[in-house]
Amino acid sequence: MKEHLTIDKKHKLVYCAIEKIGCTFWKRVFQIISGFKNVTDPFEIQAIRAYEGYLTAKGLPFDQIHFILKQSKSFIFVREPYERLLSGYVDKLFAPNAAYWAFIGTFITQNFRQNATEQNKKCGHDITFAEFVQYFIHSQHNNLRRDAHFVPNFEHCRPCEIDYDYIGKLETFEEDTLFLLTELQLDDKVKFTNFQSETERDAITDAADYVYSMRRAITKCMTMHEALFRAYRKLQIRGIISKHVPYPFTRDSQRDITIDEYKQELLAAHAQSGTSESRKANRKEALLEAYSTLPDDLLQQLRAEVKIDANLFDYEELPDVIRTAKEYKPSFKYFDVLM
């Protein structure tokens, strides 16, 4: 837990970071208030540069952590468990991510896939959501290959042991963030031009930066065409690019495209994608498609794993949208690149 506690002694703040719940954003806020970055807008800092310039509790003894918590305002953000699990899968295994393919993907193909090919076992680049859920449940029961992007919210931040002053939710992230910045008297130090549009542009930039930063490792397992298409599909799953805006490249036109050209095409696709309200349907459809692939027994096992998070943070153990997902018949398939 210690490494998740981000501390700012000057402002007497403690933030417990939970992966897949806006933690990259809040780490950039802490870079600003610590003076590490001389900007006021967190979105001016590249997401891939958000992992330095602030203090964590990792090397601190528990008595000192206890003292800091007593002197500070503390907060966490949580997220609906089924949506968070899918987000972790999309970001770390479905989208191009050679590091997670090597560490988690290969483990999954070797342990949860019948008749896996040697390429599957070597690369781990084509994991299905059902295979991922099998791995997640197994890792929780056996403490093998567990990863912070997937383990439940409560395991990160021990909310039964630490009485956090504020608990925000990703479902109301903008509203809760602006409230917190005002409440903590940080609104003069941290400012935005347009929170929502900057969030979406940030996601586009990060998707491009990440796939190009790992290009050499990724192309050992798939072509760059396939990798860039998956990054595009990830943005569609997130509701940033409409499902109605077709992928702008062919295999031939894309062969030597630069990162700047790719970003410009992503931004152009986003500009053609309509309102955020219309794009929200993408997220629900992708959720239904993913969970429709789980057999009933696996879904019930998963329900047991998310039960504590659901009860602690006022979510449903098995929402109707998840329980009835197997009845869903998609007209547009977000995960068809794995077929």
Place the predicted regions along the sequence by residue.
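Membrane-interface amphipathic segments in extracytoplasmic regions
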Residues: 1-339
